[in-house]
Amino acid sequence: VPEPTQGNALTTPDFWGDEFWKLNRDAVPELEIDPDHREFSWLHRFLQQHLPRRPDARLLELGCHPGRYLWYFHTYFGYEVEGVEYVAPAAELTHQALKAHDIEVPIHAADLFDFQPDSDELFDVVCSFGVVEHFADVEPVIRRHGELARPGGLVVIAIPNHAGVNGTVLKWIQPEVYAVHNHMSFRDLKDAIDANAELDYVAGGYLGHFSLAPSNLCPHLRQRLPWKVYALFERIYNGCVRVAHYLPNSRWFSPNAVVVARRRSHDTR
């Protein structure tokens, strides 16, 4: 398996820690997610439909900073959660944020390819939200998700949909950020799952009717426009989002794509 710093990954730890997140070592991230929020409800419903609701289930998130999804799965699914984060300061901040919510769980400062579970038990669910699209070749990353799941366990992979309008906008306003993404479609993601001999596709697709969140457009304009102009833009944008609620999920407008796959319990197809 190639190391993520040896050509396959499109980013480095320095990019995330120093350039992108600009981590404030003294600021503990806010974690709580409203499952009914318009930017999250689509994923909440999907996960409720396809993941087990067992309080003894063990979940591992790869690329877990700032810890919101770990908080979410612990709170709404009752899972025993762990996380892997390869930017060491971000791993520590994630641990602090969860501890502030009385969730004391292991957060491993490690590369996902180097991480080995502390016990012989693998995980019932292995997930990532916005990780695999930062690799030029996603096959080793998807394979690693499957290796960490127990036989019969589930793999959940969600990515921002940069194959549609969000990718076009991001390329226009932040070409340097666009450059560190693999602009894969849902079909590309599903094909990568189907190519893995140890995983069976369960469900997936484009999720969300319309949102420009993956393009970073709103924070980009908020920093550059007079506040009255931005307030007008925000009202127009929010109106578009409400109207778009009636659109079908699609490659062009949906903000995210997601797949659920199951690790095979045997070695043959």
Predicted regions and their residues:
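A short His-aromatic
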Residues: G130-H134
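A C-terminal cap/extension of S-adenosyl-L-methionine-dependent methyltransferases
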Residues: L170, V202-R269
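Conserved hydrophobic/aromatic "anchor" residues
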Residues: F123, E198-L199
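Conserved N-terminal segment of class I S-adenosyl-L-methionine
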Residues: V1-E121, V125, F129, I142, ...
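A short glycine-rich, Lys/Arg-flanked "PGG" loop and its adjoining helix->strand segment in the class I
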Residues: E139-L154
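Short alpha-helix
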Residues: H181-A197
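Short, glycine-/aromatic-enriched active-site segment of Class I SAM-dependent methyltransferases
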Residues: A158-V180
